[in-house]
Amino acid sequence: MQKLVLGVEYDGSMYCGWQKQKCVSSIQSCLEYALSKVSSESILVFCGGRTDSGVHALEQIVHFETQLKCSRSAWTLGVNCHLPNDICVRWVSEVDNSFHARFSAISRRYCYFIYNNRIRSAVFCKRVWSYSRFLDVNKMSKAAQYLLGENDFSVFRSSGSQSCSTNRNIYHLRVIRQGHYVVIDIRANAFLYRMVRNIVGSLVEVGCGNKPVTWILELLKNYRGSLNRITAPASGLYLVEIKYPRYYLFQK
């Protein structure tokens, strides 16, 4: 038995999310089907970050165990033959048996894309948040600084969170503008349920002028309520990178 790790890219627009559910299509169920077809085994996969319905990934990390021995290119090409066009295995690598895609991770990075224009985008409607009011990225950047470091992010989680601890450590949070696009780049040790989307929604409230910069600090201190924060839609959210200790070397 060997353990393999995959780098997986997907457009989550048409899926219920990562986790498999009855009677609906998920990223996990599609991957397990494709891997099982190639290996002629019943394959169970584990991911580094469970994405919600409509959320995308540029590099989701997935591991599984198998008895089949074949080349990395054979795995990649074989599995992709059984996957829909909006899911793709980018690379396959052997990994130490101690590795776990979720529990070995030391940080996750997400990017959120906002199309900030009075005229919405038809082509990218399921891949960005089309927002018509002008966003002041300088105000958003100042507000974002309050969120850096280790804090109790209870107010930024949605109902349904199963995490025992609500403390998280945000290492990096940047807000930049590229033409009509506003990008929010965030990395932390882990995230609570819908935490990124709730942070984005709150920063947008500051950027459009509905709330002052210091409102983010008020939110952070308000452990019990939401203070009318909004949740950004799933369409603009991308899982970009998951980091692991250096002794887990992947052959990409």
Curated annotation (Swiss-Prot):
Broadest EC class assigned to this enzyme: isomerase
Enumerate the catalysed reactions.
uridine(38/39/40) in tRNA = pseudouridine(38/39/40) in tRNA
**Lineage top rank: taxon:** Bacteria
InterPro entries in UniProt: PsdUridine_synth_cat_dom_sf, PsdUridine_synth_TruA, PsdUridine_synth_TruA_a/b_dom, PsdUridine_synth_TruA_C, TruA/RsuA/RluB/E/F_N
Please state which protein family the record places this protein in. Answer: Belongs to the tRNA pseudouridine synthase TruA family.
Q: Which residues form a coiled coil?
A: none
**Could you tell me the keywords of this UniProt record?**
Isomerase, tRNA processing
Q: Which GO terms describe its biological process?
A: tRNA pseudouridine synthesis
- Where are the active-site residues found? D52
Q: Name one GO molecular function term.
A: tRNA pseudouridine(38-40) synthase activity
What's the gene?
truA
- NCBIfam families for this protein: hisT_truA
Name of protein: tRNA pseudouridine synthase A
Q: How does it assemble?
A: Homodimer.
Residues bound to substrate: Y110
- Keyword Lipoprotein in annotation: no
E.C. number, please? 5.4.99.12
Q: Does the keyword Mitochondrion apply?
A: no
A Pfam family matched by this chain, by name? PseudoU_synth_1
Give the protein's biological function: Formation of pseudouridine at positions 38, 39 and 40 in the anticodon stem and loop of transfer RNAs.
